[in-house]
Amino acid sequence: MDLTLSRADYLQVGVTSQKTMKLLPTSRQRATQKVVVGDQDGVVICFGVKKGEAVPVFKTLPGQKISRLELGGAVNTPQEKIFIAAGSEIRGFTKRGKQFLSFETNLTESIKAMYISGSDLFLSASYIYNHYCDCKDQNYYLSGDKINDVICLPVEKLSRVTPVLACQDRVLRVLQGSDVMYEIEVPGPPTVLALHNGDGGDSGEGLLFGTSDGRLGLIQITTSKPIHKWEIRNDKKRGGILCVDSFDIMGDGVKDLLVGRDDGMVEVYSFENANEPVLRFDQMLSESVTSIQGGCVGKDGYDEIVLATYSGWVTGLTTEPTHKESGPGEELKLNQEMQNKISSLRSEIEHLQFKVLQERENYQQSSQSSQAKSTVPSFSINDKFTLNKEDASYSLVLEVRTAIDNVLIQSDVPIDLLDVDKNSAVVSFSSCDTESNDNFLLATYRCQANTTRLELKIRSIEGQYGTLQAYVTPRIQPKTCQVRQYHIKPLSLHQRTHFIDHDRPMNTLTLTGQFSFAEVHSWVVFCLPEVPEKPPAGECATFYFQNTFLDTQLECVYRKGEGVFKSDNISTISILKDVLSKEATKRKINLNISYEINEVSVKHTLKLIHPKLEYQLLLAKKVQLIDALKELQVHEGNTDFLTPEYRCILEEADHLQEEYKKQPAHLERLYGMITDLFIDKFKFKGTNVKTKVPMLLEILDSYDQNTLISFFDAA
């Protein structure tokens, strides 16, 4: 990495949504550009930068929340008309701020994504896609899952209109008119789409995608099939991708890839050998990066990466050096511009301090008045609750515009809180009376000063379902709190996948009865994550899932009056049977339940658990030895007398302890899964084997795979 960029904060607007900031084009190369940004207060602000200060060009009045901002204009001309999506309306402004368009789309849902190409307007709400030409309806498509972004391949290069939808079910849908031409499976839920090199590359068919689990890829969209070019995995476990741009920030004549993530990470990838991108620069900001674009804003001749963050900061990472070299014997003098900026900042700070003092006094006086009424200050929370495939844990991210004081986590189901490296908050646990009020967890995170983003990790137990609640209290007066609820589902560790291995030994659960397609779909939504709330189009639905903890799989096929569920894990079938029959009983629906149990599947599941259990037992054994080995080392003065295996444990002691600490109750969790498997195997035979559980735990304590399998067979 040989790119050095300096940070400059230009302006703070209201809270911003994804892709709501753009740079207006200029006629001269590397001349300063104007920035236009829309916020959730409905305000559009256009400004330039002179002598390091933001100078407004225009500012609109507040209105509905702005969900997208795009630039448009006639094809092959500078794209300098500003279009915003707010609610179900599209408004257009000139670069001077004059409104020239107000188009009410009459969509029943608010617009979530927008793309403009010449006179073509592509919009998507949660599930609905619409294509307009000159504000006249052209095409329409109803998606089976939520649409996160929409784009169109460049018409000027391909002479055809090819829209692409990024859908939550890990699929890119390539459209032709109102029909799907073909679907492209991607490794995670796609959150953002962008044209490769800003124009689709040489062919015009290059499409970049970013996913919510932090992966990045390039696909060539041909007329007949997709061609996967490359994909960058998220090995460093960074945040999900919110924005992507192409710009030559390295100055080598080849456009680089600029990436903004929801954990505040900004990355620059360059194409050294023109094949796969190489990371050349990264910098961590303290909050989500909602928009990113390369250009020139601060000073003529100096390229920079311009960002908008969740709390509304418009920031530049510029190539302009902050320090100027001085010759030998010369003193480095601050230029007049820098001195002016410092004095301006000082006076601004003094003014703000005086204003804060004044407002505090006013508040103090009014709060003591008998007539005064206190109003609760409103604040928005940007939250995300997602399942991580790598470690089978849920990541809960809470982001507030102002500093967070504390977050109280309450759960009515047993969950484990895992360590997060980025989390500097101090956590304290309160004892829970689980019998009286179903409280299994009460934990308070007290945040350090100026923390606006908090990330937590939890691991749930399948079969135990309920609600996790987060009470978020920011540092504002009067003290106020917002509650966010997250559902822990019965099969919470299952994740959607595109295909499963049909050769595995499968157990089958079949439900029949007088229930509608919508009813059985609502039961599947209740049991499993990542299932769209609306029933899919057609008479039958098929979903595939993989258990992120054990790698077992589940197939759900259902229609009106029938549901068939297949899994290589008996415990999954047992959980589904219990939960679905309970849900049907609530609605007074008679269910006919039948099942086919494959005995081979039990041995198969135990073999899947084996490497994980063996690894955890070995890790626990090594951690237990560390203190004794350290004592021996101190006593003997060296480690030469130890075997290579013990020396290795001492060398890796910190790493082993850290890993063990990160996975609390991991071993107990595996023991629990084997115990459930044992009980469930015999439950389907009508036998209660709970009295044999202590014997099973004894076998697990002196674990041997063959002995365990024999015990399962003999019981």
Swiss-Prot record:
GO CC annotations on file: axoneme; BBSome; centriolar satellite; centrosome; ciliary basal body; ciliary membrane; membrane; nucleus
Top-rank taxon, per record: Eukaryota
Keyword Cytoplasm: yes
Annotated compartments: Cell projection, Cilium membrane; Cytoplasm; Cytoplasm, Cytoskeleton, Microtubule organizing center, Centrosome, Centriolar satellite; Cytoplasm, Cytoskeleton, Cilium basal body
Pfam families in alphabetical order: BBS7_GAE (PF23360), BBS7_hp (PF23349), BBS7_pf (PF23361), Beta-prop_BBS7 (PF23743)
Gene Ontology biological process: brain development; cilium assembly; eye development; fat cell differentiation; heart development; limb development; non-motile cilium assembly; positive regulation of proteasomal ubiquitin-dependent protein catabolic process
Major localization class: membrane
InterPro entries named in the record: Bardet-Biedl_syndrome_7_prot, BBS7_GAE_dom, BBS7_hairpin, BBS7_pf_dom, Beta-prop_BBS7, WD40_repeat_dom_sf
Disulphide bridges, residue numbers: none
Protein transport recorded as keyword: yes
SUPFAM superfamilies listed in its UniProt record: WD40 repeat-like (SSF50978)
Modified residues (N-acetylmethionine): M1
Keywords: Acetylation, Cell membrane, Cell projection, Cilium, Cilium biogenesis/degradation, Cytoplasm, Cytoskeleton, Membrane, Protein transport, Transport
Described function: The BBSome complex is thought to function as a coat complex required for sorting of specific membrane proteins to the primary cilia. The BBSome complex is required for ciliogenesis but is dispensable for centriolar satellite function. This ciliogenic function is mediated in part by the Rab8 GDP/GTP exchange factor, which localizes to the basal body and contacts the BBSome. Rab8(GTP) enters the primary cilium and promotes extension of the ciliary membrane.
Assembly notes: Part of BBSome complex, that contains BBS1, BBS2, BBS4, BBS5, BBS7, BBS8/TTC8, BBS9 and BBIP10. Interacts with BBS2 (via C-terminus). Interacts with CCDC28B. Interacts with SMO; the interaction is indicative for the association of SMO with the BBsome complex to facilitate ciliary localization of SMO.
Name used for this protein in its record: BBSome complex member BBS7
